[in-house]
From Swiss-Prot:
The gene is mvp. GO terms for cellular component: cytoplasm; nucleus; ribonucleoprotein complex. Residues 430-452 are annotated as: Disordered. Coiled coil: none annotated. The keyword Ubl conjugation does not apply. The vault ribonucleoprotein particle is a huge (400 A x 670 A) cage structure of 12.9 MDa. It consists of a dimer of half-vaults, with each half-vault comprising 39 identical major vault protein (MVP) chains, PARP4 and one or more vault RNAs (vRNAs). The keyword Translocase does not apply. This is Major vault protein. MVP repeats lie at residues 2-55, 56-110, 111-162, 163-215, 216-270, 271-321, 322-378, 379-454, 455-517. It holds the Pfam family MVP_shoulder. Keywords: Cytoplasm, Nucleus, Repeat, Ribonucleoprotein. Required for normal vault structure. Vaults are multi-subunit structures that may act as scaffolds for proteins involved in signal transduction. Vaults may also play a role in nucleo-cytoplasmic transport.
Amino acid sequence: MSEESIIRIPPYCYIHVLDQNSNISRVETGPKTYIRQDNERVLHHPQRMVMVPPRHYCVIQNPVQRDSEEKVLFDDVGQAKLSHGDKEIRLTQDPFPLYPGEELQLGITPLTVVLANTALHLKALLDLEDESGKYVAGDEWLFEGPGTYIPRKEVEVVQTIQATVIRHNQAIRLRARKECKDREEQDRVTGEEWLVKKVGAYLPGVFEEVVDIVDAFVLTDKRALHIRATKTFRGDKGNLRRTGEEWLVTMEDTEAYIPNVYEEVVGVVDITTLNSRQYCVILDPVGEDGKPQLGQKRVVKGEKSFFLQPGESLEYGIQDVYILSEEEGLVLRALQVLEDKDEEGTEVERKPGDRWMIRGPIEYAPPVEVEVVVRREAIPLDENEGIYVRDIKTGKVRAVVGQSYMLTQDEELWEKELPANVETLLASGKDPLADRSERQGQAQEVQPRDKTRAVTYRVPHNAAVQVYDYREKKSRVVFGPELVVLGPDEQFTVLSLSGSTPKRANVIKAICLLLGPDFCTDIINIETADHARLQIKLSYNWHFDIKDRKDPAEASKLFTVPDFVGDACKAIASRIRGAVASVQFDDFHKNSNRIICSAVFGFDEAMKIRNSFRFPQNNLIITSVDIQTVEPVDQRTRDALQKSVQLAIEITTNSQEATARHEAERLEQEAKGRLERQRITDQAEAEKARKELLELEALSTIVESTGAAKAEAESKAEAARIEGEGAVLQAKLRAEALAIETDAELQRLRQARSEELRYLQDKNKLEVQKTQELAEIEIKKFREMVESIGSGTLRDIALAGPELQVKMLRGLGIQSTLITDGSTPINLFSTAHGLLGLTSKPAQEKESD
């Protein structure tokens, strides 16, 4: 600072002055004016003293030492003694200066106010003793509110602890940081955990820490809690729980459950509810001692609701009770030895592995000793339907046809395998007769055949099917129309016939053999004697001749020739080639039909061509041959033949054209002659018509000249007649108009009088109605007045005046009285007696009332 000699120190301020001779600093406080000496130096400008307001404090580093009277101690040289490295907490007091060496470590700070449900975690830095006890360095304790904490230099505030609010159905989980006693004076070891469930604010102890806030699990009649013990302990009810033990807590135990610190919530278990048509199988059920019975089962039937205990599980879940109708059954197998009743009610012993069957109608829930193998239903079968059944004990297979059948416990459905070509033919669904010309149709998706169903095939009319039984080693032929049902060991005989044109082998696959009549077409190549090679397209009509269809030997002949089409075509072609090879082309061209028919059918004893060609091996008969086309194989021969044919056609065409032209010219001449004659005839007719027209014109002129005068006279007469008729009609119309006008006026007057009468009637009715209503109102008013006043009151009012007058007259001695005033009633009580003189003097009566 500047070297000023005079320093004015305001009140509550101070300066530090350094004596440069002794190198000692001192404090000068105001208010004063300080004159600096030459050997002194002011270290700083005047500074305000430290003022600690109420409920505040400050911390002084290296404080000065004071005696018992709180006076500052100085050493021998006049330097203030300091407690170096120490601290002093100063509370509210008079303003004070800082001596040289003192430092304001913590400025003016409000005292810590500890609220309710709050505490300060304190730790002793040095050994100390206060009103609450003695503490050594390292001790920890709580300063609980409400209150104001006065800090001390030996104590450190570690943290502020807030109370934890415990609500309903809540608890806090505490852990001990070291050995201590909890709020309930129970000893706790380091690391121990426990729960506090008391509702309200809980302030943890100094060695307690809040691990978690645990919410209670609300239990209902449909929910339970699965608990597992993580450590051996005793529960709240005193029961011992071992490590790993599991149990359920239900609503019967408590409505809201807070798990213990050594309890682990495995999960929430929902109630299992069974209705009257359900059951379940519990695996490893818990016994009466509460322990699971491993490897055992228990069946529970509805109606029932229960919780699965820990370790229990449902086998296949909740299952429906088997409700069997009359056409259903269950195949059962015994898993253990059990006593049972058969269908007749007899006691039987079932051994493990035994199979039996129960039939409906019944409601069945299998016990644990029984296993349901399969549920059987009766298979409905028509007369033409069947199934293959195999006995699993003997292995025999049989076919059941034409009746509904339910498999027994020792039977099963057997699948019959068929060759692939047979499967294809059966699945194609083609009609053997209508679709016989189709070779390869579009591939259609067909459902796979049920191999357990009996294989059936409908044999069409006039067809045959051969079935071979491999077990009996014999065959049978079925003629249509018929339905073939294959037995377990039977197979169809598949025909492989030649097809297409020319014939190729193995083109047609068929199960049934058509007996005809039918035809087949083939193309063969022949060569004449002059080496002319020709191609002929022929069609043969054929059929099978069967005399006795019931004869198995004759019926089996049909299938002795595997490919009767190919064999027949080859035999016929061979005969034709042999016959044609011996004739010239010209002869064959002229007599092709006779040569081919004679070659095919042959001649009888009379040298006539036979009617048919018979194959004795299978009774096939060819009845006719149709030659469709004959073409040379050689191209030059074909061209020459075609050219000659075209030339012949051209010559024929020209001849026909000339003939047609000549005929057309002849017809044209005839038409022209007829036309000319018609024209002449028409001219003659026209001249005749012209003559008649001239005659009519002359007659018309005569009539016109004489008819003008006649027409004028007739018109005048007609005009006069029309005028007279008009006058008559006008007079008639005028009279009718007057009559109509008179009638209209009369009708108007009648309606006016009628309306006036109706108006008067309505008015009179309204007057009458008004009078009646007024009378009713008066009557009602009078009745209500009478009812309101009362009949007794009216009577008293009516009799009050006359009675007083009678009493007054009697008092005057008058024996007869007649009052004829219109406004008062007449007293006739004693008038008649008075006139006759019979009235006695009135006795002196004592007045009543």
